[in-house]
Amino acid sequence: MDASAGSGPSGVPVGVGSGEGMLDGVVGLPATELAAGVRAGELSAVDVVRAHLRHLAAVEARVGAFRVVRTEAALAEAAAVDAHPDRSRLPLAGVPIAVKDNVAVAGEVVTDGSRAHLPAPAAADHPVVARLRAAGAVVVGITRVPELCLYSATDGAGTVTRNPWDTARSAAGSSGGSAAAVAAGVVPLAQGNDGMGSLRLPAAACGLVTLKPGSGVVPAQIGADSWSGMAENGVLATTVADLAVGFAVLAGTEPATPAAPVGPLRVAVSTRSPVPGVRLDAAGRAALDVVIAELRAAGHVVVEKEPVITPAAALGTITRWLAGADSDAEALGLDRQALEPRSRTHARLGRWVRRAGLVRPQTAAAFRARMAGYFADVDVLLSPVVSGPPLPARPWHERGFLANITANARWAPWTSAWNVAGLPALVLPAGPGREGLPSSVQFVGPAGAETRLLWLAGELEGRLPWRRHAPVFDPAGGVGEPAG
């Protein structure tokens, strides 16, 4: 059902709960704990999903994370998990998840955040959705995105997806709906994807942990051509263990605790913004300093070493972003006159870029080779994620193309280079920042370093534990009034 069409505030029927005896205590648990309980028969997948649907109904009107809530379908799928003959082998048995509205869920419509077309329901699951379901996960809903997933705030006609930490601010984008759902405790794990930071920016905004895999590690198949190969699928989580399991499922590997490196890591620190004139705020600098101190205390070697992001690499990122709008609009058969004005301009520029042949594979290859040299004597790069607090929660879709891209560039200059390079990049919380909002940092590794990044994130999680859910919506503390 559409999230705006149900009898409850979120589209979930008011009576979805099963009364006082329902297992409300399961809401807010990590995915790994929920799955362990369902595998062992200590928890029913139906009860787990029903409890999360009830929490969704309580908070959704104030967050706006979901376009579709799959109440009946999710409960039926949960019952199938309970009856599964190999339930004890499912790594995500009974775990409620959300899926971003730009990958296919069988039987559901994929809109890519646009009203410029009327697509038919998907005939089959996207490969990453199929892998999540095969692992026992239950899709409770489809999360909101900005039109064509182009922007770093999530809003559209009649909807603004708000940050559970401060509802006056955006949950970021383009996986903003997925991030808001996790931060509000509605699901412990959500699928998203990242073409210029679309997993990492919402994770930073909402105090979550995420990993953008390197090229070819997880099936992409996002839109027409995954933005010329820049976009990758991943998950958003509240713990590193949940992230590691989600990543393993998407990558088609057996979930396992990431192995420790042989010795201390050599960590390079970079704070220089690729966008001239953008500076990191004091809270972001403090978060970096805290992480640097913990890395040194753990025995790692920390050095300053700025990567060289060439003008060609920076331009290559922008041309792929522009071209992606045009190629996706073409592949979806969109009525371009029905696009939001900002997206119409974006796609028009993208058509010119494509016709001029400005998306050049050699640009990405050259930058990857340069970064391979950079990582010859360092294991990991540490950098900021964003320059300051998330953008205000407002109808950005009503503003023009220049206003949107300027706001995006000033807030989020540190993520897109690693998309064009095809390198893995992980974001994790690093303590409270300005106005009580989360602060986060980014780790980037060479090709194939996903496990290294997950291990390092787990080590820092132990040394710098973070609050897993936004305080107002924390299932452990009840549901109060929204901030902002």
What spans do the regions from the language model cover?
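Glycine-rich, small-residue loops and helix-cap segments
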Residues: 41, 52, 94, 134, ...
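A short acidic, glycine-rich active-site loop
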Residues: 117-122, 166-169, 401-413
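Acidic/His- and Gly-rich active-site-bordering loop/insert found
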Residues: 74-76, 84-157
